[in-house]
UniProtKB/Swiss-Prot annotation:
Species: Klebsiella aerogenes (Enterobacter aerogenes)
Alphabetical UniProt keywords: Amino-acid biosynthesis, Hydrolase, Magnesium, Metal-binding, Methionine biosynthesis
Reaction catalysed by this enzyme: 5-methylsulfanyl-2,3-dioxopentyl phosphate + H2O = 1,2-dihydroxy-5-(methylsulfanyl)pent-1-en-3-one + phosphate
Cofactor: Mg(2+)
Record bears the keyword Cytoplasm: no
Protein name per its UniProtKB record: Enolase-phosphatase E1
Length: 26
């Protein structure tokens, strides 16, 4: 859910990948 919110705010795939990597570094 957080990733979706961040994606909506950022609106950038690059930032989404970065956030996803930070939230889910697995």
């Amino acid at each position: 859910m957080i990733x979706a919110i961040v994606t909506d705010i950022e609106g950038t795939t690059s930032d989404t990948x970065f956030v996803x990597n930070v939230l889910f570094p697995y």
